[in-house]
C-alpha cells in the first residue's frame, strides 16, 4: 500500500475513534479492529522502528498479569474473556505510535478530536442545565446522571476522562507559548473539562 494512501487511511480511522465510541461498542470495536488489521499488514513490511518500547513492554507485562489473575480468580471464565480483549488496546497504542512515525498530519486528527470533545462537553452542559441534550436524550433512566450522546449509558464522564490528557496535553503543547489570552483560554478549557466530568455524576471519574 502506498505511503500516502496508508497515511490517509490511518488518519481517517484514528480521527473517527471518538465518534465510533459514541456510536456504540460494536462500531468502536470494528474501527479498532480495522485499524489493527491495517497496522499489522503494513508494519510487517515497514522498516520504521516503534518508539516508547518501554511502555509497550509495560503494557504487555500488565496484560500477562491480567491473564494470570483471571486463571486464579473465582469466575475465571468471565475474567479471561474480558481480559483477553485488552490486547486490542495494546495494539491500538502501537498503531497510533506507528501513525505518528509515518505521518505528517498528526495535528489534523488531534484537532478533530478536540472539536468532538468540545461538542460533547457543550452537549453535557446543555443536558445538565435543561434536562435533555441536543438530541433530546435525558434522565429518563438515570436520575442525576448525564448521558449526553450515549443515550442510555451514563459513561460520558469516563469517555471525557479517557481523552482528557491527550487533548489537554496537545492544546498546551501547541498554544501555551502563545499570548496571555490563549493561555487563559487553555486554563478555562481545562476547568470546563474537569467541571463537566464532575457534573456527570460519575463519582469515581470525578475523584480521578
Enumerate the predicted regions with their spans:
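Alpha-helical transmembrane segments of multi-pass inner-membrane proteins
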Residues: 17, 67, 91, 107-141, ...
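Membrane-embedded alpha-helical segments of multi-pass membrane proteins
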Residues: 23-45, 83-94, 156-167, 207-208
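Membrane-interface helix caps and helix-loop-helix hairpins in membrane proteins
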Residues: 72-81, 198-203
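Non-cytosolic membrane-interface motifs at loop->transmembrane helix junctions
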Residues: 78-85, 140-147
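Short, flexible active-site loop motifs that bind/organize anionic cofactors or intermediates
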Residues: 82, 96-99, 146, 196, ...
Amino acid at each position: 500500500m502506498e505511503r500516502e494512501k496508508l497515511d490517509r487511511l490511518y488518519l481517517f480511522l484514528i480521527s473517527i475513534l471518538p465518534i465510533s465510541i459514541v456510536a456504540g461498542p460494536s462500531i468502536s470495536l470494528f474501527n479498532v479492529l480495522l485499524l489493527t488489521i491495517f497496522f499489522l499488514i503494513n508494519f510487517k513490511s515497514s522498516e520504521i522502528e516503534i518508539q516508547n518500547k518501554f511502555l509497550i513492554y509495560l503494557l504487555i507485562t500488565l496484560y500477562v498479569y491480567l491473564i494470570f489473575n483471571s486463571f486464579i480468580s473465582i469466575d475465571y471464565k468471565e475474567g479471561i474473556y474480558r481480559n483477553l480483549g485488552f490486547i486490542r488496546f495494546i495494539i491500538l497504542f502501537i498503531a497510533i505510535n506507528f501513525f505518528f512515525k509515518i505521518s505528517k498530519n498528526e495535528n489534523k486528527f488531534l484537532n478533530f478530536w478536540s472539536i468532538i470533545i468540545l461538542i460533547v462537553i457543550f452537549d453535557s452542559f446543555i443536558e445538565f442545565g435543561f434536562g435533555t441534550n441536543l438530541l433530546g436524550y435525558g434522565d429518563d433512566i438515570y436520575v442525576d446522571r448525564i448521558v449526553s450522546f450515549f443515550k442510555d449509558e451514563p459513561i460520558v464522564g469516563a469517555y471525557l476522562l479517557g481523552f482528557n490528557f491527550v487533548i489537554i496535553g496537545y492544546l498546551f503543547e501547541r498554544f501555551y507559548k502563545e499570548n496571555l489570552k490563549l493561555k487563559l483560554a487553555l486554563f478555562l478549557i481545562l476547568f470546563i473539562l474537569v467541571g463537566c466530568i464532575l457534573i456527570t455524576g460519575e463519582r469515581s471519574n470525578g475523584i480521578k
